[in-house]
Amino acid sequence: MKANIHPDYHTIKVVMTDGTEYETRSTWGSEGATMNLEIDSKSHPAWTGGNQQLMDRGGRVSKFNKRFGSLGV
């Protein structure tokens, strides 16, 4: 294997949407960084089975619905 081509692997803190925190190892961020999740398995309709609305971050959901909403299911 080539030397010095792999990213640094360190411990970070992950904060779920309900405030639950846990530590894991990752190449994301730097040692001790905090990753705040906007959508996770506790809030995503695919895992909750609900028909709840997704939070529209940056207009992405609105843009999608505007473009494909007329197709219907």
Swiss-Prot record:
One GO BP annotation of this record: translation
Key words of the record: Ribonucleoprotein, Ribosomal protein, RNA-binding, rRNA-binding
Protein name in UniProt: Large ribosomal subunit protein bL31
Single GO MF annotation: structural constituent of ribosome
Family: Belongs to the bacterial ribosomal protein bL31 family. Type A subfamily.
Subunit (UniProt): Part of the 50S ribosomal subunit.
HAMAP family on file: Ribosomal_bL31_1
Listed GO CC annotations: ribonucleoprotein complex; ribosome
Gene3D superfamilies: Ribosomal protein L31
Gene: rpmE
Organism: Rhizobium rhizogenes (strain K84 / ATCC BAA-868)
SUPFAM superfamilies on file: L28p-like
PROSITE patterns: RIBOSOMAL_L31
Protein role: Binds the 23S rRNA.
Pfam families attached to this UniProt entry: Ribosomal_L31
InterPro entries (UniProt xref): Ribosomal_bL28/bL31-like_sf, Ribosomal_bL31, Ribosomal_bL31_A, Ribosomal_bL31_sf
